[in-house]
Regions:
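Short, conserved beta-strand element in jelly-roll/cupin
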Residues: 1-14, 51-52
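Short, surface-exposed beta-strand-loop junctions and turns on beta-sheet-rich folds
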Residues: 12, 19-21, 44-45, 55
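Double-stranded beta-helix
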Residues: 37-71
Length: 71
């Protein structure tokens, strides 16, 4: 699972198809295996801290459903 903490800006967070707006100071809990996405809604940079928990931490555990940035 992951936890995101918004440090600066305004974000649209989508978890399993449900959208919420979050602001500085908000904490978002993302359940294991949930489809999730974060988008900047501010004119300033969106800054957030991501905390991962579990047994495995590597980029190859990511499954990109939609990639607007061609990663």
């Amino acid at each position: 699972s992951e936890t995101w903490v918004i440090i600066q800006g305004k974000a649209k967070v989508t978890i399993d198809g449900i959208e919420h707006t979050h602001h500085k100071g908000d904490t978002i809990i993302i359940p294991k295996k949930a489809k999730h996405r974060i988008e900047n809604l501010s004119k300033v940079n969106l800054v957030f801290i991501e905390i991962q928990t579990g047994d495995y931490f590597d980029e190859d555990d990511i499954i990109r459903i939609q990639d607007d940035y061609n990663r």
